[in-house]
Amino acid sequence: MSNYLINIIGPTAIGKTSLSIKVARHFITEIISADSRQFFKEMKIGTAVPDKDELAAATHHFIQHISIADAYSVGDFEKDAILKLKELFNKHKVAVMVGGSGLYIKAITEGLDDFPKVDPEIRRNLNQHLEEDGIDWLQKKLYVLDPEYYKTADVMNPHRLIRALEICIETGKPFSSFLNQKKPERNFKNITIGLMADREMIYDRINKRVDLMIRNGLIEEARELYPQKELNALNTVGYKELFSFFDGKTDLETAISEIKKNTRRFAKRQLTWFRKDPEIKWFEFDENSKNIFDYIESKINT
């Protein structure tokens, strides 16, 4: 009998958390969170961590389980999540995974690509360029060395940019050429549900979510984390814009506007990534849950 991993994906603020809980409750199973920023204990409001009622409605894994000071890569997540899934599949026929990061979803559904080791000096040089020349320098460099990967990369994330660039520089080959190599086999089948809406609706939901975060205390949360702003985990939309405000580089109104703008850009990149996957079954964000359950059951019973 096959095991099934039900993946709930889509752009930020589309309603993935709510649907994942409904699916988990319907199939009496548990949820793997693949949202890399919700891993961190100290980042709650700005990452839209499920609230107490949502966490109580279904068992979640990989929510606020590490500190922002911890080194935790997508490779670490792959190993930990696969072990957790083995445990879950001993109890359940299906499990649910939810998230908006295509890379973290792919790490579990397909496995990570095998990248060569990189000379640490290359990474140091790239970090120095980031410090002295800013993220724009990294973006332009990646566009030149690997325009194909640039199309879908999270170009506002310097950690991801540096990772791609160091592979390009070390090997002389595009980072994208190492993607989609033969992966380890998985002992489960994937059923992937994508939530979508028109652009205006997505942007409206994002703007309202940011306003809610501000009302719920995001500014205070960011202020507490400000002394640690150099940590990679905090180079995240919702925090870095407020850090600029605390630094006196901008006013609060502009910072909040930048959070909304950068979140909208992030949603656009998420959709660009996911739309390449023909295996995703797309539903409108307000689709009747029963129709989604029926689709999942039809795939399981095929």
From Swiss-Prot:
**What is a biological process (GO) this protein takes part in?**
tRNA modification
Q: Where is this site: Interaction with substrate tRNA?
A: S101, R123
Catalytic reaction annotation: adenosine(37) in tRNA + dimethylallyl diphosphate = N(6)-dimethylallyladenosine(37) in tRNA + diphosphate
Q: Which cofactor does it need?
A: Mg(2+)
Q: Which InterPro entries match?
A: Dimethylallyltransferase (IPR039657), IPT (IPR018022), P-loop_NTPase (IPR027417)
Record-level Gene Ontology MF annotations: ATP binding; tRNA dimethylallyltransferase activity
Q: Which Gene3D superfamilies match?
A: 1.10.20.140, P-loop containing nucleotide triphosphate hydrolases
Any Pfam family hit: IPPT
Origin, by domain of life?
Answer: Bacteria
Q: Indicate which residues the UniProt annotation says bind ATP.
A: G10, P11, T12, A13, I14, G15, K16, T17
- According to its UniProt record, the EC number is 2.5.1.75
Q: Where does substrate bind?
A: T12, A13, I14, G15, K16, T17
- Residues covered by region (Interaction with substrate tRNA): 35-38
Query: Which keywords are on file for this protein?
Result: ATP-binding, Magnesium, Nucleotide-binding, Transferase, tRNA processing
The family line of this record is: Belongs to the IPP transferase family.
Q: What does this protein do?
A: Catalyzes the transfer of a dimethylallyl group onto the adenine at position 37 in tRNAs that read codons beginning with uridine, leading to the formation of N6-(dimethylallyl)adenosine (i(6)A).
Subunit comment for this entry?
Answer: Monomer.
State the HAMAP family in the record: IPP_trans (MF_00185)
Specify the protein name.
tRNA dimethylallyltransferase
Species for this entry: Christiangramia forsetii (strain DSM 17595 / CGMCC 1.15422 / KT0803)
Lineage, please? Bacteria, Pseudomonadati, Bacteroidota, Flavobacteriia, Flavobacteriales
Q: Name the gene behind this protein.
A: miaA
